[in-house]
Amino acid sequence: MAGRKLALKTIDWVAFAEIIPQNQKAIASSLKSWNETLTSRLAALPENPPAIDWAYYKANVAKAGLVDDFEKKFNALKVPVPEDKYTAQVDAEEKEDVKSCAEWVSLSKARIVEYEKEMEKMKNLIPFDQMTIEDLNEAFPETKLDKKKYPYWPHQPIENL
């Protein structure tokens, strides 16, 4: 049992080392060594515990009913294994995270396309020292003064000054 569970719970330490900050490298190496220690201890355990030789104890224990009593109690003992109620929740959260990451990546790619268009527009601009006011207003419409809405100088709201 220990060997089968161990194969499922491996950690990709190279990927883990890439995502942790530089100031936490010592903590991560400590965690890795502790994990390796526990993994080796768990791997050393047999899959099933060794069987108890009750006949040997019955022959060598002086009190007659003591071994029979222990055997009955030992066979009646059932260690409850807690149910795993969090794995399904973690898997569901992982699926949601994958969806949100994919959505974020697609939105980021769209933003990158917009920013590349804007960069291309900036590269194709007339140099600022050669621009006229009309060229500036054409390239950047937000700089144009609105003389109809604000007929008095500075032709923009006081809050923007």
UniProtKB/Swiss-Prot annotation:
Pfam family, one: Mt_ATP-synt_D
Annotated positions of the N6-succinyllysine modification: 78, 85, 95, 144, 149
Annotated signal sequence range: none
GO molecular function, one term: proton transmembrane transporter activity
Keywords: Acetylation, CF(0), Hydrogen ion transport, Ion transport, Membrane, Mitochondrion, Mitochondrion inner membrane, Transport
Residues where N6-acetyllysine is found: 32, 63, 72, 78, 85, 95, 117, 144, 149
InterPro entries registered for this protein in UniProt: ATP_synth_F0_dsu_mt, ATP_synth_F0_dsu_sf_mt
Cellular localisation: Mitochondrion; Mitochondrion inner membrane
Residue positions, PTM N-acetylalanine: 2
GO terms, biological process: proton motive force-driven ATP synthesis; proton motive force-driven mitochondrial ATP synthesis
GO cellular component terms attached to this protein's record: mitochondrial inner membrane; mitochondrion; proton-transporting ATP synthase complex
PANTHER family: ATP SYNTHASE SUBUNIT D, MITOCHONDRIAL
Subunit structure: Component of the ATP synthase complex composed at least of ATP5F1A/subunit alpha, ATP5F1B/subunit beta, ATP5MC1/subunit c (homooctomer), MT-ATP6/subunit a, MT-ATP8/subunit 8, ATP5ME/subunit e, ATP5MF/subunit f, ATP5MG/subunit g, ATP5MK/subunit k, ATP5MJ/subunit j, ATP5F1C/subunit gamma, ATP5F1D/subunit delta, ATP5F1E/subunit epsilon, ATP5PF/subunit F6, ATP5PB/subunit b, ATP5PD/subunit d, ATP5PO/subunit OSCP.
Family of the protein in this entry: Belongs to the ATPase d subunit family.
Record function comment: Subunit d, of the mitochondrial membrane ATP synthase complex (F(1)F(0) ATP synthase or Complex V) that produces ATP from ADP in the presence of a proton gradient across the membrane which is generated by electron transport complexes of the respiratory chain. ATP synthase complex consist of a soluble F(1) head domain - the catalytic core - and a membrane F(1) domain - the membrane proton channel. These two domains are linked by a central stalk rotating inside the F(1) region and a stationary peripheral stalk.
Protein's name in the database: ATP synthase peripheral stalk subunit d, mitochondrial
Organism of provenance: Homo sapiens
Lineage: Eukaryota, Metazoa, Chordata, Craniata, Vertebrata
Name of the coding gene: ATP5PD
